[in-house]
Design a protein with these regions (language model features):
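An N-terminal assembly and electron-transfer interface module characteristic of large anaerobic redox
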Residues: 90, 94-101, 300, 405-413, ...
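A mobile "lid/hinge" subdomain adjacent to the ATP/sugar-phosphate binding pocket shared
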Residues: 119-152, 163, 431-464
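Phosphate/ATP-binding catalytic cores across multiple sugar-kinase/actin-like superfamilies
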Residues: 16, 20, 153-177, 218, ...
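Glycine-rich phosphate-binding/hydrolytic loop that grips phosphoryl groups
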Residues: 98-103, 207-241, 366, 410-415, ...
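Gly/Thr-rich phosphate-binding beta-strand-loop-beta motif of the actin/hexokinase/Hsp70
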Residues: 1, 65-82, 272-304, 375-392, ...
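Glycine-rich phosphate-binding loop plus the immediately following alpha-helix
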Residues: 3-4, 83-124, 210-214, 220-224, ...
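N-terminal glycine/serine-rich phosphate-binding loop of ATP-dependent small-molecule kinases
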Residues: 1-50, 193-208, 225-358, 509-522, ...
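Glycine-rich phosphate-binding loops at beta-strand->alpha-helix junctions
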Residues: 34-35, 169-199, 210-214, 341-344, ...
Length: 935
């Protein structure tokens, strides 16, 4: 590994080769690899592109190779050699590469070889996103916090890498024949190779010298004798051009830094001497994504003791040791009340009998208020999450969380520090006095890797890079997460907190960017725990339920894993047992396994609609079976098509409910990883129908939807409208089927029978216009009845919720967000928090067309705007918008829905959903919303 010190490593290797191998002054030298082109051009050395080098080595060393799968440090490649060479490479994302696996091993706190050994002993595979380290952390960290075994997580990471490579790179082309595995990860990790074998249903080949195929191919292509000494001299001079984009230094001189430091050191928490303290104390714990923080405060909020540690995937032993140290060393201190916040809240609450749980945003606000009573904006940047909230009239008014990317968070900086061989504490200080901070923009870790490397090649120092990364963190927070139009939009009394703001460079950039002086408490990294302790102080009854010394000394923590069968989510549950008495169930997406409630009394339109659609059963017909893939717009139009084809004498067979297994069945035919998850699922649904032996499958292209008179037009989005074309072009399994995907316009009611008669006439004999006209009448009637049912039931649930005094959440998205595999049970999470769930189509009909600030031309999106408008004057109703990651149109809808809500002083809450199944961050967002509403 070169750790970005390319020239040093390369010259060292060449000197070793010269000394130990060739003995002479010259050799046929050819350069290859992603960093090789610049070196070859500057140093006038022969270059061969690495893909060609790999293919040449494969043809020479393993004749008859059909496919090569190669995973490197930051790149992944699939080379199809049979039938003409075709190359598939990762573009913008390094998910599923060596760097990704390294990040995951760091997260698990195990060496790579141990991770491989752990994976061989797995029992369960969890769903983990492998697109980038950030997404995977979103899945893995909560699993660790819930007590899942590292054996299962390790195997799940390898399975995710295999699935990511196949779905993201093969792009629909089958991987078969003689398949070679190359590159470091596939060479060193036997369980990763096994994951590929299982996913592809093959036995891949790991050839001898699999690490060196690019170098071997380059050697086989050598034609020119190069003087090694000259090459070494040229490489040593390579790269220092000084030509990189830079920005002004953070501090002009050390005096300016000292003034800055003194100003911020004035905001200090009062401290007490725990060794002499007697009486009631209050415990606050913040179980974050990567760290655990705990504080003990006195009766006046003075800080008596604290701990701040990386949780290494399990916060339980850290809190156990902390409590024991207090009991053993300070017997006069009595814990009168305790509170816990963060990802590991429920785990620690159940493990140690902690009195209260508090949502993170409220904990941080409570602490911020203690230091600056008139605070109007709080920003907290942690390891992989960012929380910002505006305060109005002493209550949280608006919340911003990073949805899908942690490029503005602490783990982003830590990853770079580790990559460059520094501890994060040392790396952070390097940038303070950088002469020319590199301008890196505000992009994600993967994009920035290449920019950092290029800047290094151009002569940027590590100091310049450290400062540049601090700038990018702040810009990402302000312009990507908060999306502030100006500095004034944030507020005048800003409190910053979280471990990342302990970095003086980040703090300086933040103040410079906003042009304001902010408050950073000296316990910036402990604010969540401190806020929890203050909250506990306010809730104290004098006696805490935290377990005592004797029970703590005999404390044991055991973990079991099982599948839940109480609802269609089939969650993989992690059962934590503490000392045989208490237990905590993690991994559940609803409350059924915890409370054993049936859910029959819950007011949930999502469940109601899903059950309604599942009630459409096949009716045997003379014309045989016809399959409909149950996804995308079929979640809206199933009643229409079911009535239509049943009337024509077809037995309508609908594909099964989505599941991870169904997705995996179709993933090899997905041609692009950028399409939204609901569209990706369609491949699995079509495959399921084919596997069932259905020979006629109906999935039409539909440019237009029904016109509900709410917008300027009534299109379907391009993915919904034309995805049948993608299915037809990429799924070879349809070769033996009659796949009907003609263009249909159900909005043209009078024209529809004639069009459908022509379409069906191409595939079936004997279908008359009269039959189709009759079927069309049945279809439109069934659809109207379905809509009437939804609207009526929605009204009924709203009235019942009002009668019970419940909060009502209009969970707004697309019809296909009903799919439990897509929404991950968010509707049930909301009902478990005591609110009713209404869908947007149940209320959008109650609004007449109104002016919007955007072109309103999509039927489903018009409903979103109408739902936002409808709840504007309803005090007990609020809206939560579901957004599928990768949805281009929602870049527009989210801003417009936010605008409509904020015009009516409503809080806008957005939840981005895709393959990631863990709802830790979602729960924080929803609980924050409810906490704000209570105020």
């Amino acid at each position: 590994r070169h750790f970005s010190k390319i020239t040093e490593k390369m010259t060292g290797l060449l000197e070793k080769v010269k000394r130990d191998v060739i003995g002479g002054q010259s050799a046929e030298l050819t350069v290859s690899g992603s960093a090789g082109m610049g070196i070859s051009q500057t140093c006038r050395l022969p270059f061969i592109q690495e893909v060609y080098a790999t293919s040449i080595a494969a043809k020479r060393l393993v004749p008859g190779t059909d496919v090569i799968i190669e995973l490197g440090g930051e790149d992944a490649k699939i080379l199809f050699l049979s039938g003409g060479m075709e190359v598939r490479m990762n573009g913008s994302c390094a998910g599923g590469t060596g760097a990704f696996i390294d990040q995951m091993a760091t997260l698990l706190n195990v060496p790579l070889d141990e991770m491989d050994a752990l994976a061989s002993k797995y029992e369960k595979i969890y769903t983990i996103a492998s697109r980038c380290g950030v997404f995977a952390k979103s899945d893995i960290q909560p699993l660790l916090n819930q007590g899942a075994r590292k054996t299962d997580i390790s195997a799940s990471i390898f399975a995710a890498v295999a699935n990511q490579t196949i779905a993201g790179l093969a792009q629909g082309r089958p991987i078969k024949g003689k398949v070679l595995y190359l590159g470091g990860p596939l060479t060193f990790l036997s369980q990763l190779r096994l994951s590929f074998d299982k996913a592809l249903k093959i036995k891949g080949i790991l050839p001898e010298n699999s690490l060196y195929f690019v170098a071997l191919g380059a050697a086989f292509c050598g034609t020119e004798q190069i003087n090694i000494d000259d090459a070494i001299d040229n490489i040593k001079k390579y790269g220092v051009t000084g030509k990189f984009l830079s920005i002004p230094p953070l501090f002009e001189n050390k005096q300016q830094y000292e003034e800055f430091k003194n100003r911020h050191e004035s905001c200090r928490v009062k401290r007490g001497d725990i060794s002499s303290y007697k009486g009631d104390a209050f415990l606050g714990v913040d179980a974050g994504s990567t760290t655990v923080k705990a504080v003990l405060t006195g009766k006046n909020g003075e800080l008596l003791s604290s701990v701040y540690k990386g949780n290494s995937g399990n916060p339980v032993p850290i809190i156990k040791d902390y409590l024991l140290s207090i009991y053993n060393s300070y017997p006069d201190v009595k814990i009168a009340c305790s509170a816990v916040t963060g990802y590991g809240e429920e785990l620690l609450k159940n493990a140690f009998g902690i009195d209260c749980g508090i949502v993170e945003t409220v904990a941080h606000f409570t602490a911020a208020k203690f230091f600056r009573p008139n605070v109007d904006f709080v920003i907290d940047i942690g390891g992989q999450d960012m929380k910002c909230f505006k305060i109005r009239s002493g209550a949280i008014d608006n919340i911003f969380l990073n949805e899908a990317c942690s490029s503005g968070c602490g783990s982003f900086l830590q990853t770079f520090a580790n990559t460059l061989g520094y501890k994060i504490e040392d790396f952070a200080k390097l940038g303070l006095f950088a002469k020319h901070p590199v301008d890196l923009g505000s992009r994600c870790t993967v994009f920035m890797n290449s920019q950092v490397k290029q800047a290094q090649k151009d002569g940027a120092t590590v100091e310049d890079i450290s400062a540049g990364l601090s700038v990018s963190v702040v810009k990402n927070a302000i312009y990507k997460v908060i999306r502030a139009p100006s500095a004034d939009a944030l507020g005048k009394n800003i409190v910053v907190q979280g471990g990342t703001f302990l970095n003086d460079a980040v703090l300086r950039v933040f103040e410079n960017e906003l042009g304001v002086e902010v408050t950073r408490p000296d316990i910036s990294g402990l604010m969540g725990a401190y806020g929890a302790a203050l909250y506990a102080m306010g809730k104290s009854s004098g006696k805490s339920s935290v377990i005592g010394k004797s029970e703590l000394e005999n404390f044991k923590h055991e973990v079991k894993v099982t599948n839940c069968g109480l609802c269609s989510n089939h969650c993989r549950l992690t059962i934590n047992i503490f000392g045989g008495k208490r237990r905590f169930i993690g991994g559940n997406r609803c409350e059924k396994p915890v409370t054993k409630r049936s859910g029959q009394n819950e007011l949930d339109m999502y469940d109601y609609k899903l059950n309604l659609l599942r009630s459409y059963k096949p009716v045997p017909g003379a014309r045989g079976k016809l399959g409909i893939p149950m996804g995308l717009n079929m979640y809206e139009l199933l009643p229409f098509w079911h009535a239509f084809f049943t009337s024509l004498g077809f037995e309508v067979v609908v594909s099964p409910l989505s599941s991870r297994e169904l997705y995996t069945e179709g993933q090899a035919t997905i041609p692009s990883d950028t399409v939204c998850f609901p569209a990706k699922l369609m491949h699995g649904h079509v495959q399921a129908l084919v596997n069932e032996g259905i020979k006629n499958i109906f999935y039409p292209c539909m440019s237009y939807n029904f016109d509900e008179k709410l917008g300027d037009n009534h299109y379907n989005c391009p993915v919904v409208a034309y995805y049948p074309e993608v299915i037809s072009a990429n799924m070879r399994c349809l070769d033996g089927c009659n796949f009907i995907h003609d263009y249909v316009g159900i909005h043209r009611k009078h024209d529809f029978p004639r069009k459908m008669t022509a379409i069906l006439g191409k595939s079936f004999s004997g279908i008359t216009y009269a039959e189709v006209k009759k079927a069309a009448k049945a279809a439109y009637g069934a659809y109207d009845a379905y809509l009437a049912d939804i609207r009526s039931k929605g009204g009924e649930m709203i009235r019942e919720a009002e009668k019970r005094g419940m909060q009502i959440i209009v969970l707004s998205g697309r019809p296909y967000h009903l799919d439990p595999e897509i929404n991950h049970g968010i509707n049930r999470l909301i009902t478990s928090l005591g609110a009713a769930v209404i869908s947007e189509d149940a209320v959008s009909c109650r609004v007449r067309r109104f002016h919007t600030e955007v072109l309103d031309q999509w039927t489903y999106h018009s409903r979103l705007y109408a739902a936002a408008k409808y709840i504007g004057d309803k005090p007990d109703m609020n809206l939560v918008q579901l957004v599928s990651f990768g949805c281009g149109v929602d870049a527009i809808t989210t801003d417009e829905v936010r605008r409509i809500l904020e015009e009516n002083n409503k809080i806008y809450t957005q939840i981005k959903i895709d393959e990631i199944t863990n709802l830790g961050a979602v729960k924080i967002r929803l609980r924050s919303l409810f906490a704000a509403l209570e105020k």
